[in-house]
């Protein structure tokens, strides 16, 4: 009930990202795990890093609270509080705030942003995938103020809807956001972002917008508002290393390599080979290596995407992608 072994991958990544965050500050961090449950994240941060100066773990469930208190007892730096993360009675601000709810993080975001230092990092999980990227359109409008995009792009659109909502919550607090590392994996969305001073209008919009250059979206279909800016900070991502203590070290390492490749091509939405062929009426899809080589030979950047093994991200417009596919198909 209070420990999910399937999320050990994410906790491995948390350890790695926390170390980078502390390295940037050149000091140990003040951390708040807002929905701590058994406190496994806090235990790993305290046990596997030297990045934590002080930690507050809050939990409202009385049964979980007992586990949490026992698990964090060895560390004087850790405080356990029975509090509602939506309305915490906390006076301090934190360098790192983590939200890992069951379902939507939306009710907890205002308090998390309020308690986060300027320049601090907010890490957020959302598991309401049927809302952000599925058929529950009404719930998405109610929770996030956006319409999901019901195409093969739904998962990326869901991630960007979550970021747009985070930008809106931060904006209401007079702050901005800077995404560091954002991804979709299995049944969850995960976002690491930095809280910034406001810097003009955030990159938000509905798709398709005038001049939209990406993969075709069926006529009459609209999605958003969503985040149209980068999903990654390549410099930050390049400093994230697999911790020696990782439970899923090889998987985390391969994932980071894939995200680093993807971060080099900053474009809204990816192409999926089968969808491109279907849209163009091509019977046989070209091999991915030939697609990549053809686009690169024409001067375009191209990279794999973590969102789909048959997907790729490129700075080439749809017209160029379509032209390359037709040429490759004619050569078969």
Regions found by a protein language model. Give the residues of each.
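SAM-dependent transferase fold signal centered on methyltransferase-like domains
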Residues: 1-332
């Amino acid at each position: 009930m209070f420990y999910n072994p399937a999320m050990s991958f994410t906790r491995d990544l948390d350890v790695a990202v926390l170390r980078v965050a502390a390295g940037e500050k050149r000091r140990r961090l003040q951390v708040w795990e807002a929905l701590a449950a058994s406190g496994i994240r806090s235990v790993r941060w305290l046990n596997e890093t030297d990045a934590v100066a002080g930690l507050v773990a809050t939990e409202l469930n009385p049964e979980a609270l007992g586990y949490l208190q026992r698990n964090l007892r060895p560390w004087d730096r850790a405080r356990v509080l029975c509090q509602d993360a939506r309305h915490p009675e906390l006076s301090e601000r934190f360098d790192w705030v983590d939200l890992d709810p069951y379902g939507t993080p939306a009710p907890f975001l205002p308090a998390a942003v309020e308690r986060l230092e300027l320049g601090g990092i907010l890490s957020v999980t959302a598991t309401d995938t049927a809302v952000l990227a599925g058929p529950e359109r009404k719930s998405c409008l109610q929770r996030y103020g956006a319409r999901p995009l019901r195409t093969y792009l739904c998962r990326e659109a869901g991630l960007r809807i979550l970021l747009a909502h985070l930008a809106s919550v931060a904006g209401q607090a007079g702050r901005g956001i800077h995404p560091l590392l954002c991804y979709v994996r299995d049944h969850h969305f995960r976002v690491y972002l930095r809280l910034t001073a406001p810097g003009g209008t955030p990159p938000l919009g509905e798709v398709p917008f005038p001049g939209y250059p990406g993969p075709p979206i069926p006529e009459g279909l609209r999605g958003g508002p969503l985040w149209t800016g980068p999903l990654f900070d390549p410099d930050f991502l390049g400093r994230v290393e697999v911790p020696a203590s990782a439970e899923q070290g090889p998987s985390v390492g391969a994932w980071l390599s894939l995200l680093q490749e993807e971060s080099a091509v900053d474009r809204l939405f990816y192409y999926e080979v089968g969808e491109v062929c279907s849209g163009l009426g091509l019977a046989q899809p070209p091999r991915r290596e030939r697609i990549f080589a053809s686009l690169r030979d024409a001067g375009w950047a191209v990279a794999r995407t973590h969102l789909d093994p048959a997907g790729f991200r490129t700075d080439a417009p749809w017209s160029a992608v379509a032209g390359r596919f037709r040429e490759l198909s004619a050569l078969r």
